[in-house]
Amino acid sequence: MLRVLAPGDGLVEVAGVKNYRSILFAAAAIVFAVGSSVQAAPEWLTDYKKAQQEAKTSNRLLLVDFTGSDWCGWCIKLDKEVFSKPEFKDYANKNLVLMEADFPRAKAQAVGLKKQNQELAQQYQIQGFPTIIVLNGDGQKIGELGYMEGGATTFIAELEKLRKG
């Protein structure tokens, strides 16, 4: 609410400045609280040796996503329905090291990365996309998944079966 202090002097007073500041402070506190409670998205590594080492030292499983990120419809669907969901990100932060072995058609890719991904695809006999390989900390394959209906909840349940052996 604006109130003129004196006729003709052009000065105005904002009534309730104290309340306005209180509201701003409360809003800032809420934004900070919400922002700090959101867990960071897990990092998708591309270096196999680094990912394997991290899985071993952190005692987590290594999930390797063999994907055609810019052309494979099922890969894009898996990313949209599973990997981008908060419940998967939460699960991954606690239990997985994530690695993407991408086989793009339109995106440029470093020669060394392309070679590494091709060697991994041969090693794990990848026949199609998406293929998800799950390895233990010692690099032993404990499971293989692909796209499945049911979203993040179903996918996490399958990962839990593999994790618990």
Where are these regions (language model features)?
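A short beta-strand-turn-helix
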Residues: 44-62, 92
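Bacterial N-terminal signal peptides that target proteins for export
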Residues: 4, 12-25
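Short pre-active-site segment immediately N-terminal to redox-active cysteine/selenocysteine motifs
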Residues: 59-62, 67-71, 128
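Bacterial N-terminal signal peptides
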Residues: 26-33
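Conserved redox-active cysteine motifs that mediate thiol-disulfide chemistry
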Residues: 67-83
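Sec/Tat signal peptide C-region and signal peptidase I cleavage site
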Residues: 36-41
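Non-catalytic, surface beta->alpha helical segment in thiol-disulfide oxidoreductase systems
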Residues: 81, 119, 123-165
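Thiol-based oxidoreductase modules, predominantly thioredoxin-like and allied folds used
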Residues: 44-45, 85-115
